């Protein structure tokens, strides 16, 4: 039996930057695409789309890296002879990367004193790798050479053929990192949400290349390779006194990010929510998701009960635990209008007992999110699409931006506004205006939002498929790039125009707690132009009961 030695270790709870990723293999998708999703949830993260053009670099050229969070100078590293174009989190070869942070155990959670942080590890890798396997090799080389200045992370990797989950943590005061990467089996989906998920994993055998360690990366392109890991991932834990069992029984997650109540309820529960809506038989993991460490553990991947299209994947990123005991629309915290959002802090105490609000996939503090779609049957510039949205996933619109795009739409452009500077032309601020207004009377207003959301996304998906088919045979690179720019920018402009109309309609329709009558997208008036008297639906009966229980003697009507 393996034995985990956990004394004198502090386990981090929910990280400040809490995100959600879904990973969909080629065989699990409806059209042979691969998908990864990423919701960048942070109270300080602004929604914008980074662009870095491809470039040739002279000998001796260097790259200065600034910390992804603090923007402080981190490290300067040599440039290779050539780097690839990157649009957000996907490059010109349809390699896409997402992440979620889990921190891990002390003293590894702070990372090396110097080195590359997780954000720059993503961006530098996208500039240097063409597929998932190259990405694993590049990431290992970067952290081994320059150090890893962050704690525990889970990365999602996708290219047109494969999807992988890659988990890593620093070695603390010792330079470098320990990590494990596993290929998601074809036909399956995987996910992670701020909790390490790879437990035991296949290790190197004498007559098999199914699993290789970092000393054997020369074999990484062999098709049978399905697991890759740092050669000292077990040895390092043993040297630190954190594990003393057999190498074959070693669990990466249990050693470097042991389960806690918050790791289950605030993190694993989000993966459960995705699996629960996509696969059969997930009820058995409900107790685990709700915080029972002794319950049956959620598997690393599951086989979905249907093939997933791009809109199915978008839908899986829109969830408040509806239909489960954790449904955020149903408890008293949702208020009379069933608002599934809770302001921070998440935890609270009453009469000496501790409680927690749920942490759902859809949350108010999302800076941006995306669905990255990779399609091997199309030219790379056209095949890779980052369906990009800002703010809350439940009320965002995913706009198609091609990986071959060279002109980012103004509404997503870097520098167009910030968390401390409002911009009328920034999608982030417009979508926040709409979402935050909806939180006032959520159950009614969100339906108006979803109607326009569906209108736009249905059109965008249909138009994108037709557009890709029409331009798949284009051999003039310059003409193709111009068309990609036009298509993506036109959709972004249409989205902004339609969302401004929605913003104005919501204000007119719902101002002051009223609900004005609407017909054919316009506020109804009488023949003389006077607005019809609005609807004023009462609060639900249970809410009136709470008012009476709390203040009934003061509010009671007397004769």
At which residue positions do the language-model features occur?
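Accessory, solvent-exposed terminal regions and/or long lumenal/extracellular loops of proteins
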Residues: 257-353, 359-361, 447-450, 455-468, ...
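Substrate-recognition/cap regions that form aromatic- and gly/pro-loop-enriched pockets
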Residues: 330-472
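Short, well-ordered beta-strand elements within core beta-sheets of diverse protein domains
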Residues: 122-128
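N-terminal signal peptide c-region/cleavage motif recognized by signal peptidases
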Residues: 13-17
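A contiguous strand-loop segment
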Residues: 19-118, 138-307
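Histidine-centered catalytic/metal-binding microenvironments
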Residues: 453-559
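Positively charged n-region of N-terminal signal peptides that target proteins for export
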Residues: 1-4
